């Protein structure tokens, strides 16, 4: 029996994608091979690779000025790879810290340069806001400005992206990429691990403006130097072939759903239903400012936290899994990525109401 999976990542995948992957497991398109067995330079895998790149470019409307790269190491590795590729002759990069992940990025950058905290969204209740551009205190000549536009742990999503002129804007989009249209031209670099909205764990997507490919530090490993990866069409080393294949199936699924405009409408509906339920109750609490509440990751707390384990056990009994909040913040978290259907959110909301009534 399939359950409703609210995991923050690895996360739910579309059932259509899983079934197609199962059907093609032993024999991909009459090749007699599984994708897992293919040479990454053979014509069979190259067709998968090129289709995935083309479909992602179409979905996000990536301009010709930007290259799409498939790497490894996830978003955490990019916290090191970004400064190694962008600091160049500069020492300083600016960070707007809105949650746990941008804080990790800031801390990692200290190994390669001098990160500057331009703004923070931390309050007495934790990370609950996204500082407006007027609050940012940028340094004189930063190599780039870093944002995490959706904080998976804290549930803060930044929707308003300012124009920084000549300063490259770098965004960790791991947990909201492909959930809504984006103006990719505003960014110097976008990066995201796949295991939330792109596909399965193993591949990392980096979208980088071509004029930024010549800034790498000499210490940057060749396999992580964007210029080298781009020159080799993401095949400098053996890529995570099966993860790219799954990502390609997800891209095709998204196109069949009507693209990102249609997906965004669904995601707004799902998030509104869940937040409305939280706000209308006297039992559940979300502390994030409404204007920057994440559509993908919804943290909430029970008024009586001694009942947390009862809540999770009851949810599991109804087939509602992976609702425990991150250990750093506690409480609950429902990650409602693209592949989580509206029916799953409705089932969660029904359970939340029942649980609240039983405890009243």
Curated annotation (Swiss-Prot):
It is found in: Cytoplasm. This is Phosphoserine aminotransferase. The keyword Amino-acid biosynthesis applies. Keywords: Amino-acid biosynthesis, Aminotransferase, Cytoplasm, Pyridoxal phosphate, Pyridoxine biosynthesis, Serine biosynthesis, Transferase. Its cofactor is pyridoxal 5'-phosphate. NCBIfam families: PRK05355.1, serC_1. It comes from Burkholderia ambifaria (strain ATCC BAA-244 / DSM 16087 / CCUG 44356 / LMG 19182 / AMMD). It catalyses: O-phospho-L-serine + 2-oxoglutarate = 3-phosphooxypyruvate + L-glutamate; 4-(phosphooxy)-L-threonine + 2-oxoglutarate = (R)-3-hydroxy-2-oxo-4-phosphooxybutanoate + L-glutamate.
